Amino acid sequence: MKKALKIVVLAKQVPDTRNVGKDAMTPEGTVNRAALPAIFNPEDLNALEMALALKDETEGSTVHILTMGPPRAADIIRDAMFRGADGGYLLTDRKFAGADTLATSYALSCALRKIRPDVIVAGRQAIDGDTAQVGPQVAE
């Protein structure tokens, strides 16, 4: 019998850029996130799907989402639970606004040390920045 696993999926809420309107950009040339609806990062949905498949293979396993963002980022935790996740963790504080990938990775790593998962799954990259750095930085 396989040991039950505590699986955590790193996920991000990103702006939905499929239907960008005239207010999508700020005068400074950055994305006006308030003007765009927010969605579950598609690459992270792939990670969630993989985690849920692993959960199904190993009796007693759990899947939780870990995300960092404003309070509305809790929407992707609810979405993940609708898809089969057992719960989630939201790191939220105004001080996190504008965090770069290193700061984000550090905050997520601190949370992971407290959560103590057996397996961590991350998507390839977020569609809003395309840096593909948070997963590898958390892995270090």
PLM regions and their residue ranges:
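N-terminal glycine-rich FAD/FM-binding segment characteristic of electron-transfer flavoproteins
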Residues: 1-140
